């Protein structure tokens, strides 16, 4: 799981203004970090199907946020894709 310090570091890197914690960019970055963590987890725990379902749910959430951002502002979408290295 994400430690509070790591989560705060991600929020600070992607926030749009001082008190920003809920913008799509921040949410996408946090979900991406959780996806990375779970992907590493599955390299050692191949039979953890319960968590794998959670991973698919998180990937779907991130996909929805990315679709929303693409529809709302294409430049911000391209920026976050490039910054996080998400293939799309």
Curated annotation (Swiss-Prot):
Native organism = Citrifermentans bemidjiense (strain ATCC BAA-1014 / DSM 16622 / JCM 12645 / Bem) (Geobacter bemidjiensis)
Q: Which family does it belong to?
A: Belongs to the universal ribosomal protein uS15 family.
| Gene Ontology molecular function terms on file | rRNA binding; structural constituent of ribosome
Pfam families tied to this protein: Ribosomal_S15
Q: Which Gene3D superfamilies match?
A: 6.10.250.3130, S15/NS1, RNA-binding
- Role: One of the primary rRNA binding proteins, it binds directly to 16S rRNA where it helps nucleate assembly of the platform of the 30S subunit by binding and bridging several RNA helices of the 16S rRNA. Forms an intersubunit bridge (bridge B4) with the 23S rRNA of the 50S subunit in the ribosome.
List where the protein spans the membrane: none
Q: What is said about its interaction partners and assembly?
A: Part of the 30S ribosomal subunit. Forms a bridge to the 50S subunit in the 70S ribosome, contacting the 23S rRNA.
Protein name, per record: Small ribosomal subunit protein uS15
Q: Which GO terms describe its cellular component?
A: cytosolic small ribosomal subunit
**What keywords tag this UniProt record?**
Ribonucleoprotein, Ribosomal protein, RNA-binding, rRNA-binding
Q: Which domain of life is it from?
A: Bacteria
Gene Ontology biological process terms, A to Z: translation
Gene of this entry = rpsO
